[in-house]
């Protein structure tokens, strides 16, 4: 088992104790992700499917729970072992949440919801925010790349229409990002996000 694939450990430390902080009787938690604004007034949503396929399609295992218990206890956190054991026993290790989102590649005005997540089992109300860290990381990096390249494409196209051939736009921003990012996963996510807007790339992991 690789620690990086253990979804239980794919969170912030403070999230681990939050199950103790919800009001008594809580049965559901609904969270959403939005771009609150910045340099651009529109965001290109991208990255969620890659996260789901990589981290959520496989169930957690007893080994995942044991390893998480050992690590988080040593880290000084009150691990919700009973909650994760319940997920393993009741749901065969699959996480009882539903995630909804706009289609990948959609251009969305800022201050609008991009994705939502909520628990589907009242016993697992705490799970929604446990997954927040991983979801934000999974979405914001490729979404930022896709958004940046979308706006860069507009600038290039404006000048092509004045001085060149607009039909060549798809190959006017070439991606060599594989050599400049922190990991192969980052290269793949950023490279795929670039391909939402352009066709030129040397980032092989982006087309896998």
Q: Where would I find each of the regions flagged by the language model?
A:
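Generic detector of short, locally flexible boundary/turn motifs and exposed helical patches
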Residues: 63-65, 76, 80-82, 118, ...
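Low-complexity, highly charged intrinsically disordered N-terminal segments
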Residues: 29-80
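Generic structural signal of hydrophobic/aromatic residues within well-ordered alpha-helices
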Residues: 48-56, 67-72, 83-88, 131, ...
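Active-site-flanking structural segment that lines cofactor/substrate pockets
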Residues: 65, 69-104
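Buried, small/hydrophobic-residue-enriched core segments of structured protein domains
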Residues: 2-39, 87-96, 105-109, 114-208
């Amino acid at each position: 088992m690789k620690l990086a694939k253990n979804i239980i450990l794919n969170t912030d430390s403070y999230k681990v104790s939050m199950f103790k902080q919800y009001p008594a009787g809580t049965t559901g938690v609904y969270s959403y992700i939005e771009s609150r604004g910045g340099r651009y007034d529109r965001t290109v949503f991208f990255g969620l499917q890659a996260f789901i396929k990589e981290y959520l399609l496989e169930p957690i295992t007893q080994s995942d729970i044991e390893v998480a218990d050992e690590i988080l206890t040593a880290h000084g956190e009150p691990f919700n072992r009973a909650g994760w054991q319940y997920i393993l026993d009741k749901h065969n290790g699959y996480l009882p949440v539903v995630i909804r989102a706009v289609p990948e590649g959609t251009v969305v005005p800022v201050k609008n919801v991009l994705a939502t997540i909520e628990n589907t089992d009242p016993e697992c109300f705490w799970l929604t925010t446990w997954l927040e860290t991983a979801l934000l990381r999974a979405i914001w990096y490729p979404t930022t790349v896709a958004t940046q390249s979308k706006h860069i494409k507009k600038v290039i196209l404006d000048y092509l229409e004045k001085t060149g051939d607009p039909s060549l736009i798809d190959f006017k921003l070439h991606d060599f990002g594989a050599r400049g990012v922190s990991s192969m996963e980052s290269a793949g996510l950023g490279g795929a996000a670039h391909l939402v807007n352009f066709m030129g790339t040397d980032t092989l992991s982006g087309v896998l």
